[in-house]
Amino acid sequence: MVRNKAKGFPNQNNNKFEGEPRAKDDYASKRADGSINSHPQERMRASGRR
């Protein structure tokens, strides 16, 4: 069995991903002020369709 370290994958030490994070504020369950975002089914559906 060959482990990932033996295959010589690049970027071993710096595991930061490029680009924006996938989680957007529009689809978060809580707002920045701590209040709960309503309509969770609509929020989850919209998050999956983006």
From Swiss-Prot:
Cellular compartments per GO CC: endospore-forming forespore
Superkingdom field: Bacteria
Subcellular location, record wording: Spore core
Chain residue ranges for the region called Disordered: 1-50
GO biological process per UniProt: asexual sporulation; sporulation resulting in formation of a cellular spore
Identification of the protein by name: Small, acid-soluble spore protein K
Induction conditions: Expressed only in the forespore compartment of sporulating cells.
Keywords, comma-separated and alphabetical: Sporulation
NCBIfam families: PRK03081.1, SASP_sspK
One Pfam match: SspK
Species of the source: Bacillus velezensis (strain DSM 23117 / BGSC 10A6 / LMG 26770 / FZB42)
Family, per entry: Belongs to the SspK family.
Biased composition (Basic and acidic residues): 17-33, 40-50
